[in-house]
Amino acid sequence: MAAITASMVAELRAKTDAPMMECKKALTEADGDLAKAEELLRVKLGNKASKAASRVTAEGVVASFVGGNAGALVELNCETDFVAKNDDFLAFSKTVAELVATQNPADVAALSALPLDGSTVDAVRLALIGKIGENVSIRRFVRFETANKIATYLHGARIGVIVEYTGADEQVGKDVAMHIAAMKPVALSSADVPAELIETERRVAEQKAAESGKPAEIVAKMVDGSVQKYLKEVSLLNQTFVKNDKQTIEQMLKAANAAVQKFALFVVGEGIEKRQDDFAAEVAAQVAAAKQQ
């Protein structure tokens, strides 16, 4: 059997980006034949990628990019917070954000088909899955194109905001974006709050008010009051400015002769149900699988 040297492992790793141990295993299996080892490794990575691609991705990052008159916010998911800090994963996230801003894809499918590094975005994604051993997915993106100004804010890499605004002071845009990340409004104004959210809040308020035992007309006023309070709490313009509790966002903007046209807020994993592993069941499944082999 041919001796497997460190330089051979390094050369194979440079060609495939595979982990060192995987490279050594492939070279051993190929009896030192570099070309054969590369082929074996690509097959293994392909299998690894296809298996990983079915797993739940509830961790990840939000990335942003602003260039010219366009800006983008994207969410990419992985399986663990460890991989969410991986340099290759972070670099891919930033590249995807730039592609969204500059290429204006219609949806995630169109984005995935865009050319990248002599291949496509999706091919690069699959190669990344093979390299890091976890599923990686592009979940969503939003793109603003405007003659107005665009501001973005990232809180760590888990919360991202993009804002379209007008006004001479760029600090206003930064402040509004930071406020949105902290207070998480669901709409620009009370009139923009989705009807389904209002109905849910009204039902909750009705149930609480009904338990008070007060007359129907009082209950109706209590419900209306609760709904109005909710609308103020979740609409950006009505929220109290986090940097000055004496002002609402609307008042702050007016004082700065500025206005917000729209915004988007992404929180990593929002709405994704994380997989809760049953350790005992997992061990039992592994034992059963081993017996079948």
Curated annotation (Swiss-Prot):
Primary location group: cytoplasm
Location of this chain's protein in the cell: Cytoplasm
Signal peptide: none
NCBIfam families named among the record's database cross-references: tsf
Cellular component annotations (GO), alphabetically ordered: cytoplasm
Protein name: Elongation factor Ts
Organism: Burkholderia cenocepacia (strain ATCC BAA-245 / DSM 16553 / LMG 16656 / NCTC 13227 / J2315 / CF5610)
Family stated for the protein in its record: Belongs to the EF-Ts family.
CDD domains assigned: UBA_EF-Ts
Stretches the record annotates as Involved in Mg(2+) ion dislocation from EF-Tu: 80-83
PROSITE patterns, sorted: EF_TS_2
